[in-house]
């Protein structure tokens, strides 16, 4: 049996071409699509055996040089007496589709009606599991968010057991390969028309058995822990932002990496400033006399000097925004600062005395149309509707 002929590819075929051809043939001859068909079962085992060799660079090189009896073949050649064990053939099948069997709309869901998990794709077959990621929320003052700050967080979780270095055993001799699943962490069972892969009940999917557990972690390889973590919050962060600290989550198991720590930011509101992106908005109320005559005004800022001198031009209208450049929030990516936007609010006087009212009446008697251009423009527009209105 020539493995290249079995898969229908040339001897110069790329790994992608070999995998593509195997997938097509494996699906075609899969026992769940051909129940009771002995010939299809035989072909399924053959293409699985061929793929198991040609998908491995070392085995393929040895096969190309020496044939089926190469040094990487093991006793009886690459396939021995052929891949007669359906469990091995199905395991090869699972490996070929391993990256695509999770989530809705996956290959297997379309082909076998959502049985991806039934074919055993439930994580690393060797039992190595990355540690869980953790998340914490931190609240900053407006000023801390503006200048950046270093914070100390207390994080609860799991750390690698120092006694056994994460192995879970008191010594190397205290670990053995699981006899039931042969280290794969899964067992395959035939149920009616389906070949179902499930977590090995003996080892719980670990692929190994601990015969002499570590006394500190009781065979878990991890222990509960509370630790202080220092996190540098960059200047310019805003509510809803998230910082990722790789490797600061729970310790992994069986040599897998630790999870990550996600720090979610909340920024308190400020009594004076409102933030819009990297810009700050300051509401500045002024009297109508200052609005008419203009003025110079000290306005607060978030920078070290604490205040900035602002010129309010005469005749300014309520709602006008005056910009002070580079006095806003720092950009979180280091691209400068925003601006301080001062929104002027002209306040109409209230609770006037009779003397003040009389002065205003005298002022009104001196008003001219050019003193109120918007009013004049409005009256000009409606003059045709109300002929009795005059400027």
Curated annotation (Swiss-Prot):
Zn(2+) 2 binds at residues 178, 181, 200, 203. A zinc finger (CR-type) spans 148-226. Keywords: Chaperone, Cytoplasm, DNA replication, Metal-binding, Repeat, Stress response, Zinc, Zinc-finger. SUPFAM superfamilies: Chaperone J-domain (SSF46565), DnaJ/Hsp40 cysteine-rich domain (SSF57938), HSP40/DnaJ peptide-binding domain (SSF49493). One of its GO terms (cellular component) is cytoplasm. CXXCXGXG motif repeats lie at residues 161-168, 178-185, 200-207, 214-221. It comes from the Bacteria. Its cofactor is Zn(2+). Belongs to the DnaJ family. Homodimer. This is Chaperone protein DnaJ. It comes from Chlamydia abortus (strain DSM 27085 / S26/3) (Chlamydophila abortus).
